[in-house]
Amino acid sequence: YPSTNIKIDDFKRHLKIIEENKIEFINPKDFENELQNNKLQRKILLTIDDGFLSFYKNAWPILKDKKIPFILFVSTREVGAYNYMTWDQIREISEEDFVEIGNHSHTHEYLADESNKLIKDDIAKSISIFKKKLGKNSDFFSYPFGEYSNNFKIIIKDFGFKYAFGQHSGVIDETKDFYELPRYPINEKYGEFKRFKSLTKTLPFKYKKIYPDEKYLLQANNPPKVKIEFHKDIKNLDAVSCYSNEGNEWRQSNIKFENSTTLFINVAEKFIGERGRINCSLRDPSGLWRWLGIQFVISEK
């Protein structure tokens, strides 16, 4: 699928770009330490969602040969199904000390729309299968479709996960909510080389708080009233620019500062479809770009 796939030649070129820029890969086992240390060094945590067989056949031999660390997120219901990896293949990969097999739910359904009981039952089943097939569950979780609500986040935390990833863009740092960590999606649509090079030159955009705290929007709260409280040490914050896909069309957002560190984003039209997105960027004095992505899940109710 173009939305979840990248051509192998493009993938090889991306790895070469990372190597040429002397950017290191993070071993998932060192993730907690890396968040707190080595903050001046750009590093990449590679994640792969879904566990498709094409990954095992094409990308895995390359990553194994180069010993490039990564997290492979798998949904337990799909393992062994047509075009998906088997548990034997997953176990083979998991034996390498630079690989983490992350939890991606059991069913890979749109769980953010479901009741707490259904979410809990789904995650409990995936954990049970992880323990049976791999001997343990993972500390890492990836929300199906990158969609979450506050309730979903609490459930994931209560099950003992330490980190959970969405699909909103941005750079991770120690100030981020560990249960809504950003990632840059790279696929056939968003894998163009110029874009990829620009992503390797982004920095964390640190903030204290984003409002609304709930990223699952009922129609009564769509469009949301968005406010971001930034940290004081960000230079040239008044030069920030933001874009959103309100009204089903990407456009520059009208923004207003309440004070030197508090930004209001005027989302004038409703978000259409399943997801609403806002991206804010700011050129740093170093020449790199600070990047912050926000994703809302839009309820039909």
Over which residues does each language-model region extend?
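Terminal accessory/targeting
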Residues: 1-42, 54-57, 61-88, 186-301
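Short, hydrophobic beta-strand segments that form beta-sheet elements in well-ordered domains
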Residues: 23-27, 141, 163-164
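Acidic, His- and aromatic-enriched active-site or binding-groove loops in soluble protein domains
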Residues: 161-170
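Active-site proximal loops enriched in glycine and acidic residues that flank catalytic Cys/His/Asp
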Residues: 145, 168, 300
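Metal-dependent polysaccharide deacetylase catalytic core of the NodB/CE4 family, i.e.
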Residues: 1-5, 34-44, 52-154, 162, ...
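Short polar/acidic secondary-structure junctions
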Residues: 170-171, 233
